[in-house]
Amino acid sequence: MKKNITKTIIASTVIAAGLLTQTNDAKAFFSYEWKGLEIAKNLADQAKKDDERIDKLMKESDKNLTPYKAETVNDLYLIVKKLSQGDVKKAVVRIKDGGPRDYYTFDLTRPLEENRKNIKVVKNGEIDSITWY
């Protein structure tokens, strides 16, 4: 009788440990998936805001018949990305009256690096020309 009780206790301990491990794995997996969904939602929201901002900047310039203007390198990148056609991989943007640092090079196959996003564009930010590669 004592052996049966011991076997039952050991078996129930093993089963409980297995269930506990499975629930922890399930919680970890669910948490991981949830964070992934939150990140994807945040990226989609940010892309939508950026797109609306660039549309507004481009419509203003088209309405006033002035060259496109960008305040930051991120704005410049988004304008170039929106204007790109076909399988363009690189773009070089020249800024009007920018001096020796009047051009910006973008690789359109990858997103813009975080450390370049908030850099101010030289002079008034008017685009003089865009060369596609």
Curated annotation (Swiss-Prot):
**Any Pfam family hit:** FPRL1_inhibitor
The positions making up the signal sequence are 1-28
Q: By its UniProt entry, which InterPro entries does this protein fall under?
A: FLIPR, FLIPR/CHIP_sf, FLIPR/CHIPS
- Location(s) in or outside the cell: Secreted
Q: Which UniProt keywords apply?
A: Secreted, Signal, Virulence
Q: Which domain of life is it from?
A: Bacteria
Q: Looking at the UniProt record for this protein, which Gene Ontology cellular component terms does it annotate, in alphabetical order? A: extracellular region
- NCBIfam families referenced in this protein's UniProt entry, alphabetically: PRK13033.1
Q: What does this protein do?
A: May be involved in countering the first line of host defense mechanisms. Impairs the leukocyte response to FPRL1 agonists by binding directly to host FPRL1.
Q: Which family does it belong to?
A: Belongs to the CHIPS/FLIPr family.
Q: What is this protein called?
A: FPRL1 inhibitory protein
The gene behind this protein is flr
